[in-house]
Amino acid sequence: MKNANLSFKGQIPFNEEFDDIYFNTEKPWLESEFVFTSALDEIWQSKDSFIVAETGFGAGLNFFTLCKKFKNSSKKLHFVSIEKSPIKKEDLLKIYENLGIFKAYVKKLVSLYPPLISGIHRINFAPNITLDLCYGEADQILPELDFAADIWFLDGFAPSKNGSIWSEDVFKQIARLSRVGTIARTYSCAKIVKVGLKNAGFLLSLKEGYARKRQMSSAVLEKKDENLKDAWFARCEPVGSVNGKTALVIGTGVAGLATAGELAKNGFKVVIAEAKSEVATNGSGNHCGALMPLVTKPGVNLGRMHINAFLQAVRFYKANLPKSLIKFNGCIDYAFDDELVKRYSSWQDQSAEDLFKFNESLKPYPGIFIKEAAYARPREICKFLSSNFEILFNHEYESRAHLQNGKISVKFKNKKSLETDILVFCTGSKSSEIFKDYDMQISSVRGQVTHLKPVLKNELPLSAKGYICPAVKGVQVIGATYARNEICDTPKDEDNAKNLSDVSEFFDTTKAAIIGSRVGYRSYSGDRFPIIGALHDEEFYKQNYKGLFWSKNKDNNPKASYEKNVFVNFAHGSRGLGTAILGANLITDLVLARPLCIERSLFFELHPARFLIRKLKKGLK
């Protein structure tokens, strides 16, 4: 990706690539209000939350104009905007300095501005305003989005300058991301716009234009193609009104507590159940750990997912944790073999310097500096996040049953039970036992970390064959071992020796003093992606998709069926500090019918039914 090639014609921002202005400097916010945000007035009284989508974020003028409208309102705005070439921070600041308006908004945006990485970047802009900045070409990023907009702002550069954003395929995607009754507004009355809207199912009307523009286009979606591609990955039914509803989250690791926090923030009365007598007794219970993404070659889905999760986690922890629990000093991930050197160096021409930078002269190996990586105290984070919740300790899950009143009755092994409206399993390594009858390929992996008396004065995590965190409270953590399907709660001397061997490039391990060890169990999936989403109806899938070997490319397969209001967020492996936050946000998106916080292709990779679907497509079930 590249930033916008922007210049100034006097005080007017001008895009050199498209040979067009972003807007006129004669109070352009008034045109934004007239053409675009006035559409909100037509439906303002009918809803409490709105999804507004836009083709062409540009300088963010329409977004800021909407922010002003929602500033003193209890209503919620979720704004989704695509952008091929984001404007540089310094140019954004200059634009609004020249305009003399929205200065506080632009400073806030600049402080949260995403790196130049294609995909969806979620920004919690205000308590009632969410911004999804979607970087990429319109025809490539729109198919990756999933929501039903209330209003569309069609605000790309003029059709004569940038025809690709007004193409037939783009209009089809706009219709897919709408519902019957969705409003579309644009300043343009060009033929390509009118034909594109009509062919996509919109009823077009021409309205009086702003100032010197004679007319503008307004349209309402009349009909929609309901054929589903990839029907087996269709979204579940949302919960509907949250008013008075309860949520039960099982598990008090990072995944469980982050999920509980997101649901509570959105109006649910949340209760958390924990099998043990305290929080974070398993994989989230380490004294110190690193927040860093798995870096693959560019474009690999596993790496794309980890970068998205990492960026969501960085924003979450910065907004919700005290600085004493996490330090964003960056991290160095060393390429200790030729394959890793190839992988990391392939990012050099990807304009990703805001995220990480490859340095072949680092010692003891070439490596990448991951700018916003951090070292954190997972156990203390869990204690902090749990402080505002009702937690039922010594409540180990046993079974569930759906009641006629729509609620779910959950029974625990201590003979107690609880009714809830929604149920979320954040059960880590216990998930393989709970969901043993599901085709999910979950396994438990034993991991041991070693606690050293401080031996290296590193200010950031160093990662090669193993990792070493900075010393915290007189303890330096190194790790970690991996032993799939092994159960042994007692630390092993040979595992401590392995951990020391794996960090021997960084210090003389013969001088290391071991002062302790910790064993935890992580959950892993068979394809290394977490398992996040609505829990599918296994029998429905086997019955209705048994012919996928022949029909997988058709659009007439029945829509997926799910166990009502049951969700899962587990199999986070060794990078749960990042992916658990993605899971919390994604489940909340599904529950509330919000836009998805991750691209559809990655949503499919996380889907709990993906292993079953792969077998059905191969005719193996």
UniProtKB/Swiss-Prot annotation:
Cofactors that this protein relies on: FAD
Catalytic activity: 5-aminomethyl-2-thiouridine(34) in tRNA + S-adenosyl-L-methionine = 5-methylaminomethyl-2-thiouridine(34) in tRNA + S-adenosyl-L-homocysteine + H(+)
GO cellular component, one term: cytoplasm
Main location: cytoplasm
EC number(s) stated in the UniProt entry for this protein: 2.1.1.61, 1.5.-.-
Name the record gives this protein: tRNA 5-methylaminomethyl-2-thiouridine biosynthesis bifunctional protein MnmC
Any Gene Ontology biological process: methylation
InterPro entries: FAD-dep_OxRdtase (IPR006076), FAD/NAD-bd_sf (IPR036188), MnmC-like_methylTransf (IPR008471), SAM-dependent_MTases_sf (IPR029063), tRNA_MAMT_biosynth_bifunc_MnmC (IPR023032), tRNA_MNMC2 (IPR047785), tRNA_S-uridine_synth_MnmC_C (IPR017610)
Molecular functions (GO terms): oxidoreductase activity, acting on the CH-NH group of donors; tRNA (5-methylaminomethyl-2-thiouridylate)(34)-methyltransferase activity
Stated family: In the N-terminal section; belongs to the methyltransferase superfamily. tRNA (mnm(5)s(2)U34)-methyltransferase family.
Chain positions covered by the region annotation tRNA (mnm(5)s(2)U34)-methyltransferase: 1-222
Function recorded in the entry: Catalyzes the last two steps in the biosynthesis of 5-methylaminomethyl-2-thiouridine (mnm(5)s(2)U) at the wobble position (U34) in tRNA. Catalyzes the FAD-dependent demodification of cmnm(5)s(2)U34 to nm(5)s(2)U34, followed by the transfer of a methyl group from S-adenosyl-L-methionine to nm(5)s(2)U34, to form mnm(5)s(2)U34.
Source organism per UniProt: Campylobacter concisus (strain 13826)
Compartments reported by the entry: Cytoplasm
Gene giving rise to this polypeptide: mnmC
Keywords of this entry: Cytoplasm, FAD, Flavoprotein, Methyltransferase, Multifunctional enzyme, Oxidoreductase, S-adenosyl-L-methionine, Transferase, tRNA processing
Region (FAD-dependent cmnm(5)s(2)U34 oxidoreductase): 250-621
Domain of life: Bacteria
